[in-house]
From Swiss-Prot:
Entry superkingdom: Eukaryota
Protein's recorded name: Neurotoxin 3FTx-RI
Lineage, highest ranks first: Eukaryota, Metazoa, Chordata, Craniata, Vertebrata
Keyword entries, A-Z: Acetylcholine receptor inhibiting toxin, Disulfide bond, Ion channel impairing toxin, Neurotoxin, Postsynaptic neurotoxin, Secreted, Signal, Toxin
GO CC annotation: extracellular region
Organism the protein comes from: Bungarus fasciatus (Banded krait)
Record-annotated disulphide pairs: C24-C45, C38-C62, C64-C75, C76-C81
Amino acid sequence: MKTLLLTLVVLTIVCLDLGHTRICLNQQSSEPQTTETCPNGEDTCYNKTWNTHRGSRTDRGCGCPKVKPGINLRCCKTDKCNQ
């Protein structure tokens, strides 16, 4: 009986993927690719792009921030989806 209970607990943890955290890219513009592990409960990555007098700029990270008009924002929910 204890073995059955333990098996059910392990199966539940595996199936629910408890504790999984999202991994997002977090480099800016043309910097080398880096990643960050998002805080628990944060399951979204973002990629925002805007134009400046120096050209197009890109910022990436965890979450899905509100942006001002003129900034293109793309949010997604898989690891490293914010290319």
